């Protein structure tokens, strides 16, 4: 069962193809969006490359495409200035030309880093996303956001650079650890929470089917998530308005990640899980959202085994002032004012500008920060 979701961006439109067996079809599908030279650099990490690198390379070579494989170290640490410089140097050493392409095979780190390298290499070359985590399939591979992290925060240096094609092969999820699968589910339920109550209700009763990797459930869950993101990106590519809704849970989540040092102790999807639960509780505390919706949202996130409170992340209390400072670094902030995606209810998120710092601090203290 293959589903294709178009991302409507005029001359830069592309398809997100979702379903099993897509790695084996990658040759013909990538060849269709490649230039005449038929050469690609596949960027992957050591873990993903060991599982899927040879299979993807064989499919590409079978379509007459020359393949150079670049392997980076796994983990968020690669998504840095040093990692970008190293990847750029390796691409230059290959003498990749503008008519060639980069193929990003991996999760969000690989996609973000390879996509940013594609955006700036020789002032920009095309690239293809082949996301291998559930989180990347429903979020970072779609929409053209590419970036690296800095010590001051996550994704603060980057570019908008749309892929030519996204191949979301559901078969690759078979090797994905349960923790990574739950992280992807956080981004899936985000779409229901921000704008589709019926989808949220479906997820409440089908969470286990998704986590058990049931193909029909995955096609529906990934398909609807991508469909919603594609619709929003087509309307607001560069986050001037509605696209900011996709950051539900991310302002709180990124602040927590920054305090935790962006390491393995707290994965991005887990941070988003806490952040979404906090966004709903904060909305309820401000009187914007019914308290029962905040309770229901938290229960649905928790059902996937995701953390929903600061205490779930670590026993030591967080500093409220430090979290607020990180929130001020958020890309949605304007004029030094705090901006959050909050909710009037499940399926009804909105962008709240100039959020009161005192109210935020009182909420964080209530949440267990000091």
From Swiss-Prot:
Keywords: Amino-acid biosynthesis, Aromatic amino acid biosynthesis, Cobalt, Cytoplasm, Lyase, Metal-binding, NAD, Nucleotide-binding, Zinc. InterPro entries: Dehydroquinate_synthase, DHQ_synth_AroB, DHQ_synth_fam, DHQS/DOIS_N, DHQS_C. Zn(2+) binds at residues 187, 250, 268. It is found in: Cytoplasm. Pathway: Metabolic intermediate biosynthesis; chorismate biosynthesis; chorismate from D-erythrose 4-phosphate and phosphoenolpyruvate: step 2/7. It catalyses: 7-phospho-2-dehydro-3-deoxy-D-arabino-heptonate = 3-dehydroquinate + phosphate. Its EC number is 4.2.3.4. One of its GO terms (biological process) is amino acid biosynthetic process. Binds 1 divalent metal cation per subunit. Can use either Co(2+) or Zn(2+). NCBIfam families: aroB (TIGR01357). Belongs to the sugar phosphate cyclases superfamily. Dehydroquinate synthase family. This is 3-dehydroquinate synthase. It comes from Caulobacter vibrioides (strain NA1000 / CB15N).
